């Protein structure tokens, strides 16, 4: 079975191809919208996706060395994400499904991140840290659902860091030579300043930390603020993770999502894992950020278990939570 997957939930338009035998991933093509100034405007990102969609789709099929007629299903991320960009991917997927008579498979973006993590890390039953620009979630699988133990109460960890470096003039670009600008800035910091630290049970709040850090730049060295922001944010995440480990007694931690590419976070989680005597599984950098391959692979798992929908039912879901998705393939 072969499934083509389309990702367009935020700044990246990606198309991947997955099959149910080794090698599982046949193609993973994408192009990311980078605003010249300020934050990302959904309408501008959607325009970008519309312009690159044909090229990325053609590139994925060529990379996989297949024709669209060879695929068994079209998987598409219907949420969560930004409405305008989600609609671009949905329109492309619907058109392909109707034109070539292919089954349409709805995929939750977060489930895509998690399933590509399982595939690439070979994790068995992990505590999952899903960390990206739009999500900060601590979860694990239980009885056909991913159950959330902790999450951000406001903005996500990745979004908080992106916003900070943009507001202080360090970005865009946000990533240079594989390092986030917050890490590059923090390398020259030497002192930790007092900033809000908010953990409630296994939930975290980052908005107050962001506001305080932006104010602190006026009184303190920027490098020290970067260092403090990063260390306090990661400290909050680690505390919540330890509480979830104590509760679930899992034997391994799996990190997925774009923030999984952070070397500084990885080193902290390696120490935490060693202290707790559990394994640490980190999704490869090539699959950490948003990509079409993860949608294709999650769609493949779903289609093999009979999950597909009519085009008329393919409404986008900008606030679609991972704990709302039935997972028939993990039992």
From Swiss-Prot:
Specify the superkingdom.
Archaea
Q: Which residues bind substrate?
A: 130-134, 162, 183, 262
According to its UniProt entry, the protein's GO biological process terms are: tRNA threonylcarbamoyladenosine modification
Instruction: Quote the subcellular location field of this record.
Output: Cytoplasm
What is the free-text note on the cofactor?
Binds 1 Fe(2+) ion per subunit.
Q: What is its main location?
A: cytoplasm
Q: Which residues bind Fe cation?
A: 109, 113, 130, 290
Annotated Pfam families: TsaD
- Could you tell me one molecular function GO term of this UniProt entry? N(6)-L-threonylcarbamoyladenine synthase activity
Gene Ontology cellular component terms for the protein in this record: cytoplasm; EKC/KEOPS complex
Keywords in alphabetical order: Acyltransferase, Cytoplasm, Iron, Metal-binding, Transferase, tRNA processing
Which chain positions lie within coiled-coil regions? none
Which reaction is the catalytic activity of this chain?
A: L-threonylcarbamoyladenylate + adenosine(37) in tRNA = N(6)-L-threonylcarbamoyladenosine(37) in tRNA + AMP + H(+)
E.C. number, please? 2.3.1.234
User: Which cofactors does the annotated protein need, by name?
Assistant: Fe(2+)
Catalytic EC class: transferase
Q: What does this protein do?
A: Required for the formation of a threonylcarbamoyl group on adenosine at position 37 (t(6)A37) in tRNAs that read codons beginning with adenine. Is probably involved in the transfer of the threonylcarbamoyl moiety of threonylcarbamoyl-AMP (TC-AMP) to the N6 group of A37.
Its family remark reads: Belongs to the KAE1 / TsaD family.
Q: What is this protein called?
A: tRNA N6-adenosine threonylcarbamoyltransferase
